[in-house]
Each structure stands twice: as C-alpha cells, then as structure tokens.
C-alpha cells in the first residue's frame, strides 16, 4: 500500500476506525510476521509454524502462529492482531486522543529455544489510533540463561541502529525504559539484559516511562512511522544470529 502521509489522519471514525494509515500498519505487521516466521523456521530446520486465525466479537481479529517441538525451538509464538471498537468507559480518560472508537494493530512474539546457551526473547510492535490521534509502541528484550557478553553487545547494537537513525535521544531513553519496565522489584533484579521499550510515541509531544520524560522534537508522523518499521525489522538482525551461534553449543 502506498502511504499518503499528508492524509494520515483520514479515518478514525465509527465508520472507518483504522483509516488508510491503520490498514497500512496492519499490512506492515503481517509482513513482519512472515519475515520473522520464515527466518525462525529456516534456523530450526525441522518444525514449521501452524497458523490459527481468530476473530474478536467486538471487531477485528488476528492470526496466531506457533512452532512447537522443533530442532532448535521448544516453542515459538508469533501473533498479529488488528482490533477496533468503542473505547471502553474505563479507558476514555486514560487513553490518548478523543472520539468514541479506537483501532489497534500489532505483532507480539515469545521464543523459547531448547539449548540453554540460546536465549529466550520477547518482542512486540504496535500502532494505535483513537480519532485523529495516533501513536506507536514496541520493544524487544533478551533473557539469556548463559550470558555471553558478545551476544548482549550484538543484540543492543542491532536495536540501537534504528533508534540512532531517527534520533540520538531514542536509544538511551528506550533502553533505560526497558530496564525499568522489566525490573522485578520482588527479586530486586532485572529480567535478562534488557533491550528497548517505548509507548505512546507520537509527534509534537513528549513520551514518559512514568519516571522520566523525553520531548519528541523535529520528528513528524512520517519519521516516527519509518522508525517504527525499522525497529520491527531490526528484530531478526538482533536475535537470529545469536540463535545460529548458540543452538549447537554444548
């Protein structure tokens, strides 16, 4: 789909909650799901993903894909959804934007390799709109069972590349956000080595992790869109080489 960013705010109505930009975001996460699943199935070499389409009664649906009992992955789940409907009453004052309807699409994944030398990972990337207001969220983190510093450096370098291309402020802020988001207060420790995390990222405002704030200066909607796409595409580069390196480590 060709995107006309000058008309990005079209839609967002009860008749068309997604608009062209929402449909483009959905197409983007579907393509990303294909890319990630193809890469993981190639690395595994034995098992394949089983697809389970589903529908949401209130509007929308998705497709879940699961690979089980593979040669490399014990289980890998990669799911995409696109849902819409009325903004719940409890969210009307807490959710950005205005208007009675919302649209949300995204991809979410959790991967568990068999070999403890290969790390578990989690990632998600999402686009949400309410009326004319649209924002992005997402992130990826890595949980090694056996820590290899070179793997940690590779993972962070791959995730930092799209951040640095968009703004020098992004990576340090999103890395710190991830560290705080996945901090286990009860155990007084972080979950794995972190990664990046961001939410409610929109042009002309600020983002906050509840502790610190960052102004989103000089970046219009198109720039943030390109960052979001690049951040999602960076996941395969960040994770797959690590699994290829560690899947046969004894």
Which functions belong to the PLM regions below?
Residues 2-20:
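Short, charged, low-complexity amphipathic alpha-helix
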Residues 17-96, 212-250:
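Gly/Pro-rich turn-and-neighbor structural signature
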Residues 20-21, 46, 65, 72, ...:
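Alpha-helical protein-protein interaction elements
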Residues 25-28, 32, 36, 40, ...:
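Generic hydrophobic secondary-structure signal
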Residues 47, 52, 65, 101, ...:
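Flexible, active-site-adjacent loop/turn segments at secondary-structure boundaries
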Residues 49, 56, 100, 127-131, ...:
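Solvent-exposed, non-transmembrane amphipathic alpha-helical segments
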Residues 64-138:
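Internal mixed beta-strand/loop scaffold within catalytic domains of large alpha/beta enzymes
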Residues 134-249:
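Long, contiguous internal "core" modules enriched in hydrophobic/ aromatic residues
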């Amino acid at each position: 789909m060709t995107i006309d960013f000058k008309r990005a705010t079209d839609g967002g109505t009860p008749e068309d909650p997604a608009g062209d930009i929402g449909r483009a975001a959905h197409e983007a996460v579907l393509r990303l799901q294909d890319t990630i699943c193809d890469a993981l199935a190639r690395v595994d070499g034995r098992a394949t993903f089983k697809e389970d389409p589903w529908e949401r009664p209130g509007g929308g649906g998705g497709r879940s894909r699961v690979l089980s009992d593979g040669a490399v992955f014990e289980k890998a789940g990669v799911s995409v959804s696109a849902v819409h409907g009325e903004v719940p009453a409890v969210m009307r004052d807490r959710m950005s934007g205005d208007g009675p309807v919302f649209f949300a699409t995204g991809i979410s994944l959790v991967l568990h390799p068999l070999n403890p030398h290969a790390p578990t990972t989690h990632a998600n990337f999402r686009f949400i709109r309410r009326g004319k207001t649209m924002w992005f969220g997402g992130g990826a983190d890595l949980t090694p069972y056996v820590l290899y510093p070179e793997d940690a450096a590779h993972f962070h370098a791959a995730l930092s590349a799209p951040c640095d291309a968009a703004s020098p402020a992004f990576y340090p802020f999103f890395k710190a956000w991830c560290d705080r988001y996945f901090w286990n207060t009860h155990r007084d420790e972080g979950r794995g080595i972190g990664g990046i995390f961001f939410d409610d990222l929109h042009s002309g405002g600020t983002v906050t992790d509840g502790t610190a704030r960052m102004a989103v200066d000089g970046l219009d909607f198109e720039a943030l869109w390109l960052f979001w796409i690049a951040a999602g595409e960076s996941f395969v580069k960040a994770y797959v080489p690590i699994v290829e390196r560690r899947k046969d480590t004894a």
